[in-house]
Amino acid sequence: MLNLSKSSQVKTEANAQEAVHCKLPAGIHRWLHTLLSSLPFKLRINFWNQDSYVFGAEIRETLPQLSLHIGHPGVLRSLILSQDPLVLIDGYLHGLINIEGNLEALIPLIQTHPHIVIKPLQSLQLWVEAYTLPQLPFNLKAMPLKDGQQIHSRDRDKAAIQHHYDLGNLFYQQWLDPLIVYSCAHFEHPEMSLEAAQAAKLDLICRKLKLSPGETLLDIGCGWGALLRWAVQHYGVRGYGITLSQEQLVYNQQQIAQEQLANRLTVELLDYRDLPQQPTFDKIVSVGMVEHVGIKNYPTYFQAALQALKPGGLFLNHGISSSDICNGSSVGERFINRFIFPNGELAQLSTMLSVAEQTGWEIVDVDAWRPHYALTLRHWAENFEQAFDQVASMLGERKARLWHLYLIGCALAFENDYERVYQTLLRSKTDKTWNLPLSRMGWLS
């Protein structure tokens, strides 16, 4: 809830009275009609209870698939003057926009209109009309999160991880599988359950790494520890995990005590840049962590793993990549970075593998999992919807709806090949003797 001073409250009340009698300017209406006429669905927008228009689909007899209620003209003013669609998200979180209908319909809207485009001949009229609309008593222009720290510094990375993962273990338990695996599952067939597909993923990783009893396994960014516990209990290894999430650390410590694994498994709060700089582990794995590293830090990341790996060992790196070059400027990227997942950064697989090779790794195997992540995300979105009342009680209803939209949007991104995910198996170039199976089937047996 907004905390306004007395003077701000007076201004808000006067502003609200002004908004009651404000009509939607004709030039803004024409611009919206042009912008939204090609929508593949019907969109009804109510402007602060003064005007209501339908945009999009031509069949007027059917009901709109989506309805937006903009509660104050200052939202539209801020949108046009800033030319930033994320203003709408800020307006929603402030309670100035209400949505009725299928949230998934918003995804093609964002994809169709990634930027607010105003033609030169329209710009002056729109600017004047927007400027004359009543102003909000606070700034609604969406700005990136800033903390005065260099991006991907140790402190900023830790803050970003805790922003995303420390929403509470109970929050993630509401919609993930029972093991709390927050990464792509592996489906042997489309009807496979999420729980079974996550267990299949954990076992497949262990087999790819050729884990043997007595070996030491490092998990960089171990999450809630499911993979480590699986490897310890099913393959007899000694596990060591690192995370920057305080909530994940607490959960891991509880599970280690409960399952009496203290002599075989350790999890610590540690940055990957502080890993041992000498050969320490027989095998290393990293699942869904490289997205947090940042492209400029790829050399440091791959070097840290290489230094910590014993001769003859393997490193399995599992991470999301982009199908095209990303620079963080798209609406989708900025939405995720601002509201859900700060400081995430994706690169094309070729970029990641080039850095790995330059760092001293030999690429052994590359496995594409894109359809598996689309299925995983659909399961998460469905689970989230079923547990919506519970998660809304933790996050608040509006933030919970943004999370649901995030999961649906990510599912569509993988389904439409905007994003991809790969498991890459690496070994040190200094290991001249081939000590691995001659074919992929050798890992899967």
Model-derived segments and spans:
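Conserved SAM-binding loop of SAM-dependent methyltransferases across substrates and taxa
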Residues: W224-Y235
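A short glycine-rich, Lys/Arg-flanked "PGG" loop and its adjoining helix->strand segment in the class I
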Residues: P299-P311
